[in-house]
Amino acid sequence: MLLTTPFVSSPVRVQGNGGSGASPWAGAATALRIQAAKQLTGRVVTTKADKTVGVEVVRLAPHPKYKRRERIKKKYQAHDPDNQFKVGDVVELRRSRPISKTKHFLAVPLPPRDTRRKSQLLPPLQSQSQSQDQDQPPTPPPSSD
């Protein structure tokens, strides 16, 4: 029997016990593999150490009892070889080989987000352009003296 789930990239074959009544999902727990995140995004909170930045990563997780999503913050140490980041910068953490006891990520700059507002990206509405025309005083025609 094949087990398909959105959490596994390929179907997993599960050995059933024929008609014994055992659940086909019983052996699936051992066949699934959980992988750690390869890249995270966070904000630099400290730059005191040389070639190291402290990055705070915020994620949403459900509360065990109340099921309401809550913010969970975790701080990672990341390698910054050029000391280029400042406190408040948003960086991407990429998993790498262990650099020290606590550093397992490399800090990479993110491209700046587009700061233009939606109103600047879209053309004005027809009603907005007419109201702007009415607000402007009429310009006198050029005199031909």
From Swiss-Prot:
Biased composition, class Low complexity, residue ranges: 120-136
Domain of life: Eukaryota
GO CC term, one of those recorded: ribonucleoprotein complex
Cell location: Plastid, Chloroplast
Transit peptide: 1-36
GO process terms (BP): translation
A molecular-function term among this protein's GO annotations: structural constituent of ribosome
Chain residue ranges for the region called Disordered: 101-145
Name of the protein described by the UniProt record: Small ribosomal subunit protein uS17c
Family, similarity comment: Belongs to the universal ribosomal protein uS17 family.
Pfam families for the chain: Ribosomal_S17
Record-linked SUPFAM superfamilies: Nucleic acid-binding proteins (SSF50249)
PANTHER family given in the database record: 40S RIBOSOMAL PROTEIN S11 FAMILY MEMBER, SMALL RIBOSOMAL SUBUNIT PROTEIN US17C
Keywords associated with the record: Chloroplast, Plastid, Ribonucleoprotein, Ribosomal protein, RNA-binding, rRNA-binding, Transit peptide
Record note on quaternary structure: Part of the 30S ribosomal subunit.
Functional note: One of the primary rRNA binding proteins, it binds specifically to the 5'-end of 16S ribosomal RNA.
Source organism per UniProt: Oryza sativa subsp. japonica (Rice)
Gene3D superfamilies xrefs: Nucleic acid-binding proteins (2.40.50.140)
